Amino acid sequence: MKPLTTVDGLVLPLDRSNVDTDAIIPKQYLKSVKRTGFGPNLFDDWRYLEPGEPGMDHSARKPNPDFVLNAPRYQGAEILLARKNFGCGSSREHAVWALTDYGIRVVIAPSFADIFFGNSFKNGLLPIVLDEAVVDRLFQEVEATEGYRLKVDLAEQTVTTPSGEAFPFEVGEFHKYCLLNGLDDIGLTLQHADEIRAYEQRRRAEAPWLFR
């Protein structure tokens, strides 16, 4: 997993509350567990004018010109600005994979669904909760200013605007450690590889019949 320390990125404003995981990545795309390849189907039902299916050439599909993800000014965004209860619905981890595969590294919202919030940290995505009044302000600034960027500093736990105003955010120490060091569940386990090997060797000597 790629470490996340600071993100100085273009902001994509998704001005919708209660965005559920089926909207983030529709159910027909959940057949793979590779964690990659989901970016073209992020917000699929809103992003394209006709329904999509796995295996389609999505570059040939007609984009919805009214959906914010297709606006040229937001191409290459790394920070998603959202409304309350982002990521509600089913617990599909694919929703986080779709966001990260598209290039999103940070999601800022007034609140998140609990399961989505936990899945985000396990997959290198930083969910930041800011006060709803602050989020309202950020939406106004993003929509009024083309090329609007925010700087997210995980070590300092701040979100800084182009004017230099910094908003603090909370993150658990364990989640912070994992993101800063690029550690998912497998990476955390591999940190103890020497101890695991030593235990296996000891058990093999103590109870060889278990390994026959």
Curated annotation (Swiss-Prot):
UniProt cross-references to Pfam families, sorted A to Z: Aconitase_C (PF00694)
Pathway(s) of this molecule: Amino-acid biosynthesis; L-leucine biosynthesis; L-leucine from 3-methyl-2-oxobutanoate: step 2/4
Gene Ontology molecular-function annotations: 3-isopropylmalate dehydratase activity
Reactions it catalyzes: (2R,3S)-3-isopropylmalate = (2S)-2-isopropylmalate
Listed GO biological process terms: L-leucine biosynthetic process
Disulfide bonds: none
UniProt entry tagged with the keyword Lyase: yes
Keyword terms, alphabetized: Amino-acid biosynthesis, Branched-chain amino acid biosynthesis, Leucine biosynthesis, Lyase
EC number, as in UniProt: 4.2.1.33
Coiled-coil positions: none
Record flagged with keyword 4Fe-4S: no
Cellular component per GO, a single term: 3-isopropylmalate dehydratase complex
Function: Catalyzes the isomerization between 2-isopropylmalate and 3-isopropylmalate, via the formation of 2-isopropylmaleate.
Membership in a protein family: Belongs to the LeuD family. LeuD type 1 subfamily.
PANTHER family: 3-ISOPROPYLMALATE DEHYDRATASE SMALL SUBUNIT, 3-ISOPROPYLMALATE DEHYDRATASE SMALL SUBUNIT 2-RELATED-RELATED
NCBIfam families, per the entry: leuD, PRK01641.1
Stored HAMAP family: LeuD_type1
Subunit architecture: Heterodimer of LeuC and LeuD.
Protein name per Swiss-Prot or TrEMBL: 3-isopropylmalate dehydratase small subunit
